[in-house]
């Protein structure tokens, strides 16, 4: 099976063919570290971590680079407001970022370059653009000369005339064309700065990613990814800078994830409806947040609400309960061989369907449907009077493998005594209401969590298995 990726550049799905056989060079734009990340910021790390994991599962050696912007207007503003220096704030929120995304199941990148640690190659990149006539200095600032790059607008699919019509020159800017963008910004009084051929200053946002992608991945990379909001102007400008300098294709496949809405309203700081990751993971299991995010195709918007999160949790718990029941049954299973082929063949179908979903532009929503199918099928098998250890082990391994590809874990936290008592009371009420289906489900769910119930004349007793 071949992987196909929706390429923003061509607006169609294309067969994925990396430059080097079995190797993938992948760059994902990272955060500006001036504050804690919100769930919108967390979607790209989760999405593209999953892409990376699947590529690795398929046998690719993935070189995954994701940067930190640790000097920027927002950082300077935060430093002034807090009375701290920029490096102190950046260090604090780099650490906070790692805590958040690690909790969400994201692996560290191969390299996490920081702008301040790569200033020499950024300045060198700008100087080369100046030398080639693609950039010019203006009173200490350096701008990219957009009209000199013939392909400008090809990623956002907008004619340059339309882009120029919507652009403007801000107060204090000294550029020749409204579409020109800053490669280097002259330092203002009291700002952090670096020495350069154009005087004291710091780099513009767009040049940072171009320079660091080239340093760590070369002139042409396989996959460049980020949030939908970065397609223009950030990624458009990256293409212009990089291809103007090298004369080569900068990135062959462009991937962009969709936005997140909060209760059907676009999430934004101006509306005050954003949710910080370090807050939400205190309220909900981080694995649930990831499962929820992956239950929607990465290019589609996600509507984030507590009702939807709870509904997703119910589904996740069904899979985990099936897994727990399988693990519990393993000890009592035998070396039975009759009918094994029938169940193992069905498992193979689920595996194929899962991979077909992921091969189709990393469709995690359809892939998760196959997880439910595996769990449901396993539950059917557990109804058999006698079960085979071979089949049980195959179910367990399959669920563990598929969950791992999605960056998820199947382990369930041990229930507290009061949680067990509450579920037993809920079961008693269900039996009183003659809702035997719910009663049996609660019993089976507890069994999957290694809690054994015993109904006696004196009431229900329980013990840990």
From Swiss-Prot:
InterPro entries attached to this UniProt entry: Cys-tRNA-ligase, Cys-tRNA-synt_Ia_DALR, Cys-tRNA/MSH_ligase, Rossmann-like_a/b/a_fold, tRNA-synt_1_cat_dom, tRNAsynth_Ia_anticodon-bd
Top-level taxonomy: Bacteria, Bacillati, Bacillota, Bacilli, Bacillales
Positions bound to Zn(2+): 29, 209, 234, 238
SMART domains (alphabetical): DALR_2
GO molecular function annotations of the record: ATP binding; cysteine-tRNA ligase activity; zinc ion binding
Sites of Phosphoserine modification: 270
The EC number(s) this enzyme carries: 6.1.1.16
One Pfam entry name: tRNA-synt_1e
Cellular component GO terms held in the UniProt record: cytosol
UniProt name for this protein: Cysteine--tRNA ligase
Main subcellular localisation: cytoplasm
One GO biological process term: cysteinyl-tRNA aminoacylation
EC category: ligase
Record's keyword annotation contains Glycoprotein: no
Family statement drawn from the similarity comment of this UniProt entry: Belongs to the class-I aminoacyl-tRNA synthetase family.
NCBIfam families: cysS (TIGR00435)
Compartment(s) of residence: Cytoplasm
Subunit structure: Monomer.
Domain of life from the UniProt record: Bacteria
Binding positions (ATP): 269
Swiss-Prot/TrEMBL cofactor(s): Zn(2+)
Species in which this protein is naturally found: Bacillus mycoides (strain KBAB4)
Span of the annotated motif 'KMSKS' region: 266-270
